[in-house]
Structures are given as C-alpha cells and as structure tokens.
Amino acid sequence: MERFLENAMYASRWLLAPVYFGLSLGLIALTIKFFQEIFHILPHIFSVSESDMILTLLSLVDMTLVGGLLVMVMFSGYENFVSQLDINEGKEKLSWLGKMDATSLKNKVAASIVAISSIHLLRVFMDAKNVPDNKLMWYVIIHLTFVLSAFVMGYLDRLTKVKH
C-alpha cells in the first residue's frame, strides 16, 4: 500500500505539465498584445508626444519582462518539478537550463516582480498629476513591500547557504 501511494504521489507531478504548457499559451497572448501595442503606436509615431512614447515603451518593456518571467517559470518549474527537458546541447539551449533550483527560481521571480513593479511605478509617476496622492502612496507602499520581500528572501537564502 505504501509503495502504491508513493508511486501515485510521484506520478502526480505530471499534473503540473499542462499548467506549464498553459503558461506558454499565456506567452502567446502576451506576444499578441505586445505587437498590438506596437501596431497601435506606429501610425502616430511622428505626432505622439515624448511622454506618451515613453509610456508606450515602458509598457513594451513591462510586457517583455513578464514574458521573460513566464519563460523562466515554465522551463525551470518543469525541470524542477516534472521532468528534465531533453534538449540537445548547442546554440539553441538556454545556458541556465538545468542549473536553476527552486530557491534560485524564487529569487529570480522576486527580482523580476520588483523590476516589473518599478516600471509600473515609473509609469504612474509620469502621470502623477492625474493620480490622487493616496493612490500614489499605495503604489509606493506596494512597491516597497515587493522590494523588501525580495531582499528578505535573498538574505534568508544567503543565511541558509552559509549554515550548510
């Protein structure tokens, strides 16, 4: 009975495979939105204001960071929790594949969230005159919470590595 339960639990990790595949569908949707934003701005490229152009570019950078985060979570999560990716060595293989454990993935996700939050906060500050002060305050508090959380996770990771 024990062996059956252990095998069933071990096999259940494959339930995560469609979840990681679903993230790739999210990446497709994000790519469509990315190019939709580009095609939206192109006809107005010569008439758009500098601040609107910067806001558009920040949106594109934001989407790019989210896309990178999705790729990182998809591949690292799949390799850490489901099965090793069977990709031939060579130019196409990402250098970090197989080298990122759950802890380093968590730290990279936290750093990515801070970067995404920073860009969002910059976009808010560029339009600060139209944003109520209390809303600005909450954006800053939420961003600082992300920064502090990422710092604490990195610090705790460093502490556990030193002790072992």
Curated annotation (Swiss-Prot):
<keyword id="KW-0472">Membrane</keyword>
<dbReference type="Pfam" id="PF03350">
    <property type="entry name" value="UPF0114"/>
</dbReference>
<feature type="transmembrane region" description="Helical">
    <location>
        <begin position="109"/>
        <end position="126"/>
    </location>
</feature>
<comment type="similarity">
    <text>Belongs to the UPF0114 family.</text>
</comment>
<dbReference type="GO" id="GO:0005886">
    <property type="term" value="C:plasma membrane"/>
</dbReference>
<feature type="transmembrane region" description="Helical">
    <location>
        <begin position="53"/>
        <end position="73"/>
    </location>
</feature>
<keyword id="KW-1133">Transmembrane helix</keyword>
<feature type="transmembrane region" description="Helical">
    <location>
        <begin position="136"/>
        <end position="156"/>
    </location>
</feature>
<feature type="transmembrane region" description="Helical">
    <location>
        <begin position="15"/>
        <end position="35"/>
    </location>
</feature>
<keyword id="KW-1003">Cell membrane</keyword>
<dbReference type="InterPro" id="IPR020761">
    <property type="entry name" value="UPF0114_bac"/>
</dbReference>
<dbReference type="InterPro" id="IPR005134">
    <property type="entry name" value="UPF0114"/>
</dbReference>
<protein>
    <recommendedName>
        <fullName>UPF0114 protein KPN78578_33570</fullName>
    </recommendedName>
</protein>
<keyword id="KW-0812">Transmembrane</keyword>
